[in-house]
Swiss-Prot record:
It comes from Paracoccidioides brasiliensis (strain Pb18). Catalyzes the removal of a penultimate prolyl residue from the N-termini of peptides. Mn(2+) 1 binds at D296, E433, E471. GO terms for molecular function: manganese ion binding; metalloaminopeptidase activity. Belongs to the peptidase M24B family. This is Probable Xaa-Pro aminopeptidase PADG_06815.
Length: 506
């Protein structure tokens, strides 16, 4: 198994600057100051994305058709559903408006956006909607038209392209309306081509994700500074949302997880409504969205500015070691599955050291699946326009002998195994989110082969820890990585709790 580096002290937090300032403070952490202001990002590179997708399709002719999300009412109500743009449409348009569609003519390299027809009543009630002239100014497109032109334009394209021309769509349910008898509708080719493009982020996409992480960092810090005065998980969720919205991020990338005590052992806990009194840790998994790009950040922290006990401090240090050891090894060409193995190896050696594991070698314990009782999910996932973003292949893969150990993923939320063995590539953004959870239901359903390696008397001392997870968003580079996430961990995290309330003595 070998040995793994130990980590001490607080991690170094990089200084970053965009839409505000970030400054180191005397406590060893940093202060982030963001203001709402007009975005200074360049136009979303929709045309470049369309060209990349066409190159993946590898055909000299054809028409790509993508439907945007439509405005809709709630069932039996006159209230609209919360709008969320279709991510494939956004990737090739950069448009976050309802009721739009697009076409891209591969041969002529022409990207056309179709916007909602003018509706005076809607304009009066809801305000101005996107029109063709405004769309041309705002977006990286060649032409903008009203929706009323769409069907006729496609018919004209089909007539000019000849018999057997192809229209590429994502799904059969998202074909353009109308009768196109001489056109072949292909709903198999476009999605994998777009997935292959989306997995490698360009600089514009990366900058959106950097900023989403900046907002999330500010929100996590606000929670730390206020946690001493909070009495319920709901206040944690409310504080995080308040900071994000105040900084212009009105949407979350996923539902906030504010899990205290034993609730932190539930991976996707969502109630966020229990009192904090008597709990050791809070696991806050929450990430803002910026221009449809996700962040995914998890921090676990005590309710006061000191560790609640030896057991809690040991588990936190072990998870931090797991995470930082894996992050340090990230670069192009690394197999992500190897990092997942590494995280389990560190957990096993740590549990042997503190007495939770017994009776067997580290390799025997690993093969029994005992470590998966405490770390039941994958090390991470792709992130981008979706929090669990797309890719042609999973970042997990089979082992070199063509098999995948079943113990690795006995309880994963998303099945990560595929027949291929991909490695990390420059431009990918992945999460690294190891965790250790003391789940009573998992232990109650453990197999005898697992239980023989576990000292349940020792485990009882750790049950109050609940769960610890630490998660950052990592950009893969040619020679290493860039950590997009700067929310404080370790001692720097405790310093922020201390700053929030003088009664929280370290």
């Amino acid at each position: 198994m070998g040995t793994y580096p130990a980590f001490s002290g607080s991690p170094q937090l990089p200084e970053q600057r965009l839409h505000g300032t970030t400054n180191l403070n005397p406590a060893g952490g940093y202060r982030i100051e963001l203001q709402i202001q007009d975005a200074t990002f360049d136009k979303y590179p929709a045309k470049q994305h369309a060209q990349r997708v066409a190159a993946k399709i590898k055909k000299g002719k054809g028409l790509i058709f993508l439907m945007g999300q439509k405005a809709a009412l709630l069932e039996d109500s006159d209230q609209e559903t919360r709008f969320r743009q279709r991510r494939y449409f956004f990737y090739m348009s950069g448009v976050n408006e309802a009721d739009c569609d697009l076409t891209y003519d591969i041969q002529s390299d022409k990207l056309t956006l179709y916007v909602p027809n003018f509706d005076l009543g809607r304009e009066i009630w809801m305000g101005p909607t996107l029109g063709p002239q405004d769309a041309l100014k705002r977006y990286d497109i060649d032409e903008a038209k009203y929706q009323s032109f769409l069907q006729g334009d496609i018919k004209q394209w089909a007539s000019c392209s000849g018999h057997g021309s192809t229209i590429y769509t994502l799904h059969d349910s998202q074909k353009p309306t109308g009768d196109f008898p001489n056109v072949f509708m292909d709903s198999e080719t476009l999605k994998p081509a777009m997935d292959a493009c989306r997995v490698i982020k360009d600089e514009h996409e990366i900058e959106q994700m950097r900023h989403a992480n900046r907002v999330s960092t500010a929100a996590h810090i606000a929670v730390l500074q206020g946690i001493c005065k909070m009495t319920n998980e709901a206040q944690i969720e409310g504080s995080f949302l308040n900071t994000c919205v105040s900084l212009g991020a009105h949407n979350q990338a996923y539902g906030i997880i504010a899990a205290s005590g034993a609730n932190a052992a539930t991976l996707h806990y969502s109630k966020n409504n229990e009192p904090l009194k008597g709990r050791q840790f809070v696991c806050l998994d929450a990430g803002a969205e910026w221009n449809c790009h996700a962040s995914d950040v998890t921090r676990t922290f005590p309710l006061t500015a000191r560790w609640p006990g030896t057991e809690a401090e040991q588990i936190y240090a072990l998870v931090q070691n797991m995470q930082e050891s894996c992050i340090l090894r990230i670069k192009e060409g690394v197999r992500y599955l190897d990092l997942h193995h590494l995280a389990h190896d560190i957990l096993i050696h740590g549990f042997l050291a503190i007495g939770i594991f017994k009776a067997g070698t580290a390799d025997e314990i690993k093969k029994s699946g005992a470590s998966s009782l405490f770390f039941p999910h994958g090390l991470g996932h792709h992130i981008g326009l979706e929090v669990h973003d797309v890719s042609p292949d999973s970042i997990f893969a089979q082992d070199n002998d063509g098999t995948t150990d079943s113990w690795l993923f006995s309880s994963t939320y998303l099945s990560p195994c595929t027949a291929s063995s991909p490695t990390l590539k420059s431009g990918m953004v992945v999460t690294v989110e190891p965790g250790i959870y003391f789940s009573q239901i998992a232990l109650d359903n453990a197999k005898p082969a697992q239980l023989k390696h576990i000292d349940m008397d020792v485990v009882k001392r750790y049950m109050a820890v609940g769960g610890v997870r630490i998660e950052d968003d990592i950009l893969v580079t040619k020679d290493g990585f860039e950590n997009l996430t700067s929310a404080p961990k370790g001692q720097a995290m405790l310093d922020y709790i201390q700053q929030g309330n003088g009664s929280c003595d370290i």
